[in-house]
Regions:
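Residues within the helices of the helix-turn-helix
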Residues: 6, 17, 46
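A short, Lys/Arg-rich alpha-helix, primarily the initiator
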Residues: 1-11
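DNA major-groove recognition helix of helix-turn-helix/homeodomain DNA-binding modules
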Residues: 43-58
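Alpha-helical residues within the helix-turn-helix
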Residues: 10, 21, 50
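DNA major-groove recognition helix of helix-turn-helix
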Residues: 34, 60
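Short alpha-helical DNA-recognition segment
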Residues: 13-32
């Protein structure tokens, strides 16, 4: 699954650790999400969308 996490995070000048703390996941999980090695659960996708103030479909695409 493609996503805009890395771009959105960079726009806010957040490190992977910063985003991980906000989402309640590990930095490794953020890295795996950004590189497409891990697809988020629905609850995590909603937390990500809420964190960035965007709709899920504005962040993730197939």
């Amino acid at each position: 699954m493609n996503n805009r996490l890395k771009v959105l995070r960079a726009e806010r000048d957040w490190s992977q650790a910063d985003l991980a703390d906000q989402l309640g996941v590990s930095r490794q999980t953020v890295n795996a999400l950004e590189t497409g090695r891990y697809d988020p659960s629905l609850p995590l996708a909603f937390r990500i969308a809420s964190t960035f103030g965007l709709a899920i479909e504005d962040i993730f695409s197939e």
